[in-house]
Amino acid sequence: MDADSLLLSLELASGSGQGLSPDRRASLLTSLMLVKRDYRYDRVLFWGRILGLVADYYIAQGLSEDQLAPRKTLYSLNCTEWSLLPPATEEMVAQSSVVKGRFMGDPSYEYEHTELQKVNEGEKVFEEEIVVQIKEETRLVSVIDQIDKAVAIIPRGALFKTPFGPTHVNRTFEGLSLSEAKKLSSYFHFREPVELKNKTLLEKADLDPSLDFMDSLEHDIPKGSWSIQMERGNALVVLRSLLWPGLTFYHAPRTKNYGYVYVGTGEKNMDLPFML
C-alpha cells in the first residue's frame, strides 16, 4: 500500500483484521515520509508486517521511477528506525528453504541446520554431519522476495509500459469497472513477466502491449489459490492469497484506491493443493 495514502489504505484493508495501533500509524506516517526523502525514492510502499515470537518486522519498499525495477526493501522493529536489507540471491533462498517455523523477531538470531556431507578418505566414503548457521535476516530477505514474486499484485491499467522500456504509474487510471473487478484476469503480478514470454503470437493477439505486459492471476498454479470477494455493498473488492495466508489485496472499483499488504507469520501454505 502506498505510504502517501496510508491511513485510507489501512482502513480499506481492515476487513481482514490487519490493523495497527494509533501510535504505530503515526510513527509509520512520519518515518516513511522521511525514508522517501532521505533515500530519494519515487514511491514508498508499506509492504506489511511479519509476526515474530519476540518482536514483529515492519516492512517497507522503495520504488524508483521505473516501477518494475528491483525494489529496495527496509525493515523496522519499532516503525521509527529503518534498516536497508540486501537484495535476495538464489543462494539466500536455497539456504533459507531448510528453515521451518516462526520468525523470532531478532535479525541477528541464527538458526542451526544439520547437513550430511560426503567425505573421501582414500577409497572409503564417509558421511559427516556439518552444522550450518543461517541468520534470521537472510531468511527475512528470502521470504519477502518469495512473497513478492508469488502474490504481490496490481490491477490492470495501474501501470503502463512506454515504447522505450521503463514502466510508469498510469496517472489516467480511474479504477476497474465493477464487472472487471470481479475477474481474476483483471489483476497482474507486480513483477517482471515469466509466463507471458511462453505465450504464442495467437494468444498475445488480443493483448495491449502497453497495459498487458505482466502475468495475469487467472492462470496461477494451483488453480483456486485466490479468494475474491466483494465487500461493503460492492464498494470494495478484496483478494486474499490462500498460498501465502496473510496477503490481502484491496481495490475500490471506479477509484484509484488499490494496494496490498501482508500480515502473517511468513510461512507458505504447502498443503494448499490437497485442500482445494
UniProtKB/Swiss-Prot annotation:
Q: Name one GO cellular component term.
A: kinocilium
PANTHER family membership:
MITOCHONDRIAL RIBOSOMAL PROTEIN S18, RADIAL SPOKE HEAD PROTEIN 9 HOMOLOG
Q: What does the similarity note say?
A: Belongs to the flagellar radial spoke RSP9 family.
What name has this protein been given in UniProt? Radial spoke head protein 9 homolog
- What is the recorded function of this protein according to its Swiss-Prot or TrEMBL entry? Functions as part of axonemal radial spoke complexes that play an important part in the motility of sperm and cilia. Essential for both the radial spoke head assembly and the central pair microtubule stability in ependymal motile cilia. Required for motility of olfactory and neural cilia and for the structural integrity of ciliary axonemes in both 9+0 and 9+2 motile cilia.
Connected disease: Ciliary dyskinesia, primary, 12: A disorder characterized by abnormalities of motile cilia. Respiratory infections leading to chronic inflammation and bronchiectasis are recurrent, due to defects in the respiratory cilia; reduced fertility is often observed in male patients due to abnormalities of sperm tails. Half of the patients exhibit situs inversus, due to dysfunction of monocilia at the embryonic node and randomization of left-right body asymmetry. Primary ciliary dyskinesia associated with situs inversus is referred to as Kartagener syndrome.
Major site of localization recorded for this protein: cytoplasm
Give the originating organism.
Homo sapiens
Compartmental location:
Cytoplasm, Cytoskeleton, Cilium axoneme; Cytoplasm, Cytoskeleton, Flagellum axoneme; Cell projection, Kinocilium
Q: Which terms does the UniProt entry file under GO BP? A: axonemal central apparatus assembly; axoneme assembly; cilium movement; cilium movement involved in cell motility; motile cilium assembly; radial spoke assembly
How this chain assembles, per its entry, is:
Component of the axonemal radial spoke 1 (RS1) and 2 (RS2) complexes, at least composed of spoke head proteins RSPH1, RSPH3, RSPH9 and the cilia-specific component RSPH4A or sperm-specific component RSPH6A, spoke stalk proteins RSPH14, DNAJB13, DYDC1, ROPN1L and NME5, and the RS1 complex-specific anchor protein IQUB. Interacts with IQUB. Interacts with RSPH3B. Interacts with RSPH4A. Interacts with RSPH6A. Interacts with CFAP61. Interacts with LRRC23.
Which of UniProt's keywords are assigned here? Cell projection, Ciliopathy, Cilium, Cilium biogenesis/degradation, Cytoplasm, Cytoskeleton, Disease variant, Flagellum, Kartagener syndrome, Primary ciliary dyskinesia
Gene (UniProt): RSPH9
Q: Does the keyword Transcription apply?
A: no
